Amino acid sequence: MACIKSAQRAAQTALAPDAPYLAAGTMTGAVDLSFSNSANIEIFRLDFQSDSPDLPLLASAPSPDRFNRLSWSRPGAVEGDSFALGLLAGGLSDGSVAVWNPLSMIRSGSASLAPLRT
């Protein structure tokens, strides 16, 4: 099968429910080609209009740990809300849950605030 678009990552992924975005969090137990042990969360635009085979990276931020799961919630109920793209929640390999605001990440190009952890 032909590949339409790609982002070369060993990652857990989540699609935005109401917008053309894909989140990717570094997968637990995976080794990338650079043998890096870093953990990141990234947001890509699902852009099928361009001729480039790569998805455009909109935001990237370090994560406290690697991801076992990643989910993208529905947007908040208030129009013009600062959570208009919902929230990203990651179940991390250390057993914690980290939460990011994808709208803030996209606006700043990174995570402007550290993730909330429980």
Locate the predicted segments by residue.
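WD40 beta-propeller repeat fold
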Residues: 1-118
